[in-house]
Structures are given as C-alpha cells and as structure tokens.
C-alpha cells in the first residue's frame, strides 16, 4: 500500500519536504500503545517511539502524535522499530474533555474526513447526546454523518419519529440507516466510503461499531459482545485503531464513550447551534439575556413553538460546560451570521449547516 493510499495528499507532501530531514521516512500513526506507537508505511506496521524532545518541548497533550497523524521518523537497525522526530501539521483534530478533569483534554484522532456518529435506534438515541457529538465534531472542522444501527429492532414508524425529532431540534445532518443483522444499508455505506479518505466511528458501547467494522473488513477482526437487556453496552474496542479497508478507505474504530464531556468548543457551538445564534441576532438589544427583556427573539421563538426548549437548554448547558463564557460582540455575530439576521424565525431551523471558508482554514 502506497502512502497516497493511506491519505498522504499534496497538502501533507508539502510539509514532508519542509519538515522531514534527509534520510527520514514518512509513516501514519495507526494506534497508540501506552508509551509507544504503531505506525504504517506501505504494507507493513511497526512500532515507533518518541524522541526525548517531545517530552521536554510539548506543552500540552495536543503536541503528541495521535491516531491519524503523519510523522517523520528514522529506522533503527531493525526495520520493525523506529524513532519519531516530527509530527506533521494536522488538517483537523478530534478531541474531548477528559472525563473527571476540568482542564485536561483527551486527543482522539487527527486528519479525519468524516466522523460517523453511531447510534442504536433501539435504545441509544437522544437528541441532546447527538448535539454533544456534533459540537465536538464541528469544533474539529470534520464532516458529521449520523449512522443509525439495529434498524431491525424498531418499526419504520419509530425510526421516522427519531428523524423527525432531529429535524425539530434544528439539526441538519446526513442520516444513514443499517442493520448488521439483516445487512440492510451496508451496501449504501460501502458506496459512501471513498478511497484515500479517513473516517471514524464515534458512539457508546454496544451500538454495533465493532460488528460494523468486521462487516466492512469482510473478516472478524474485532471481538464483539452482546448488549444487556437495559441497553448498556460492553467495551469490545479497547484502543483507537486506524484500519485500511479493502475498498481503499481508512476507518478508525473508537472505544465506546459512556460520557461525552466537551472541551472548549467555540466554533463547534456556533455551528451546531447556528439557529439559536441567528435568533440572538434578532433581539432588540445586543446585550439581551434572553429572560424578560422586550423584543427578545429567543423568548418569542420558544413561546411560538419555533424553538425547541430542550434544544435551547442543551445549548446553554454545553456552552457553560465547555468554558465558552466569552460572549460574541454584536458585530461579531453579524459577521458570523451574515444573512442569518434576515431569516424569519420559522425558517431558522431549516437553514442547512455549512462550514464557511473561514472555518476551513486550519
């Protein structure tokens, strides 16, 4: 497998010529095992260790390589072990707040093209949970796709009700459905995956991520387990691992997330709740607290059933949790919203979420 097939495009090649020393080679990190990493270059995987400078110079965990990164390295006497000298710049980064620690950030993966939010439509779905995933993904400048699994366990009417709940919350996202049991939707997913692109699977334990990986690989690479009657999943994936698929795409399987604490997510909040940002632009006063002020568009939209109260409460909760306390100025909101102030409240929820050119500048 050539490096281009692993996702090394012209953007990364420019940084290779700039940052890698003569005699060094390039590889992609496919897994992290405690104090050493597993990297892939060509058809083989081998271990690599970090040079000491990483531990002296890295100010935060973000500076260390993670799954999906491209690195410059040199080999030791054995071709099965190498030392990592440099981490190439990233196109994007997927991260979350470490559960139980207010300021620590956990790095999940880098250089992801599409993040699949995997939810079981039998017992795992909740709009607020979906919004949390979207905030994290949008903050990383990654395209989100919702993947409903276990559709064989619910009726078509129940599935449609879930989709309606998503639309009622003002969420616009590509939705795919499948059943690992019947095979429905698997061909659609396979056709969606593109060669040289990198995808990841995010979701709780027990939603079928490992089973799906085995389906896409055509072999039982990952162990799978059953789910309890309460819907509580069991961890089968214990580490993040980037796997090349037969059709040429790369897929990162993630351990199940029981809790999803978001890190500081300014962009992620703005993009995931842009309907609320658009309504704030319509308030009579720029410093409106959205409580009892006259001319408050937020209060009016809630009273007129144009804004889902749970959607708004989740926005406030995530905003507070992430440490996103700095309010945008009215002028900044104007620039962010652009044409949003011209949107009637009834149309706010139907406005499709897109990444702006500014957001795509990493």
Which residue stretches match the model-derived regions?
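Catalytic P-loop NTPase motifs of RecA-like helicase/translocase cores
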Residues: 125, 154-155, 184, 258-261
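Helix-rich effector regions associated with P-loop NTPase G domains
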Residues: 23, 59, 63-70, 74-77, ...
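Phosphate-binding glycine-rich loops and their immediate beta-loop-alpha structural context
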Residues: 108-172
């Amino acid at each position: 497998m050539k490096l281009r097939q692993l996702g090394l495009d012209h953007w990364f090649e420019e940084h290779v010529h700039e940052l890698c020393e003569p005699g060094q080679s390039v590889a992609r990190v496919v897994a992290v095992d405690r104090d050493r990493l597993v990297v892939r270059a060509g058809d083989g995987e081998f271990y690599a260790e970090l040079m000491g400078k990483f531990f002296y110079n890295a100010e935060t965990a973000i500076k260390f390589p993670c799954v999906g990164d491209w690195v410059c390295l040199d080999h030791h006497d054995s071709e099965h072990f190498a030392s990592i000298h440099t981490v190439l710049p990233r196109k994007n980064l997927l991260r979350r707040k470490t559960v139980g620690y207010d300021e620590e950030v956990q790095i999940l993966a880098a250089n992801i093209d599409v993040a699949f939010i995997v939810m079981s439509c039998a017992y795992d779905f909740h709009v607020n949970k979906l919004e949390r995933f979207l905030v994290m993904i949008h903050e990383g400048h990654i395209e989100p796709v919702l993947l409903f699994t276990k559709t064989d366990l619910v009726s078509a009417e129940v599935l449609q009700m879930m989709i309606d709940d998503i639309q009622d919350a003002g969420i616009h996202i590509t939705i795919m459905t499948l059943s690992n049991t019947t095979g429905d939707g698997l061909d659609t997913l396979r056709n969606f995956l593109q060669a040289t692109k990198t995808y990841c699977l995010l979701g709780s334990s027990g939603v079928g991520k490992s089973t799906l990986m085995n389906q896409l690989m055509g072999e039982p690479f990952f162990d799978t387990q059953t789910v309890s009657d309460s819907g509580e999943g069991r961890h089968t994936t214990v580490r993040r691992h980037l796997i090349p698929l037969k059709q040429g795409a790369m897929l990162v399987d993630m351990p199940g997330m029981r809790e999803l604490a978001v890190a500081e997510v300014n962009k992620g909040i703005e993009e995931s709740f842009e309907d609320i940002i658009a309504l704030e632009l319509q308030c009579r006063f720029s410093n409106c607290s959205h409580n009892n002020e006259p001319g408050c568009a937020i209060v009016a939209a809630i009273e007129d059933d144009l804004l889902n109260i749970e959607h708004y409460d989740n926005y406030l909760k995530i905003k507070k949790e992430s440490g996103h306390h700095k309010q945008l100025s009215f002028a900044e909101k104007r620039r962010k919203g652009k044409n949003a102030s011209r949107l009637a409240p009834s149309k706010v929820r139907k406005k499709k979420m897109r990444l702006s050119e500014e957001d795509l500048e990493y």
